Amino acid sequence: MHQLYAQLCLNKANGIKQLAILLDPEKINWEAWESTVQAIQHSPANLILVGGSSHSPLAVTQLVQKLKKAIDLPVVLFPGNSAQLAAQADAILFLSLLSGRNPDYLIQQQVDAVPALMQLDLEVISTGYLLIDSGHVTSVERISQTKPIARNQVDLAVHTAKAGEYLGSKLVYLEAGSGAQFPVPIDMIQAVSNTIAVPLIVGGGLRSQREIQAAFDAGADIVVIGTAFEEDPQFFASW
């Protein structure tokens, strides 16, 4: 039974914040896999996201399979394209890149994914995906050939997020990008959170417990940590 989205909404209603660890299959150190698993198990993470911008479907499937065997947390696909699917995952963030105007990432990749998704028992969670300027060009920007929303364009971020909600997005994701120089601005998180009714995800450029807490305090319901954990698997050790 598909229950993840219902749980996310219930947590939002009850003010329960959630932390997700994003794992990129291309960047996993398999020689240190056991220690990575232990680090995740001892972290405050509630979710595992699997994805990135450029890797193969086989790498995604391999990582999801290993995670499901080792860790008792929901594993959610965060696909960079229509081929990055894995039957063993619990759910998929069905992303539409609303901040850009490239039709391939607004709708074409989604259409291409449908035949495979119809054969899988995945919980499909429509997600309005907004790329926010982070101080340098990110892989998402390069691959999607789109420009991010500027850091001072708070109204544009708010209106884009709300448009996504009106169109049916069940989640809104504000993304600074992998290895971002700067995280999503606090005033932007706050403004978007105050405008939408669906759960808000914030990720990219968050490298300390203080920054994570600031994002939560500004209204993020789910915060995603990727590069910080990737570079230091003991990132959560002092929490």
Locations of the language-model features?
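Active-site mouth loops of central-metabolism enzymes
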Residues: K17-W33, P79-N81, L131-A157, V202, ...
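Catalytic cores of alpha/beta
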Residues: S35, L77, N81-L95, N194-I225
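Conserved anion-binding
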Residues: Q84-E165
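Glycine/Thr-rich beta-alpha phosphate-binding loop at enzyme active sites
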Residues: I143-M188, E230-F236
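Alpha-helix-loop-beta-strand connector modules within alpha/beta enzyme cores
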Residues: V60-A83, A113-I125, F182-S208, S238-W239
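N-terminal amphipathic alpha-helix/helix-capping segment at the start of soluble metabolic enzymes
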Residues: M1-L23, K27, A113-T127, D133-S134
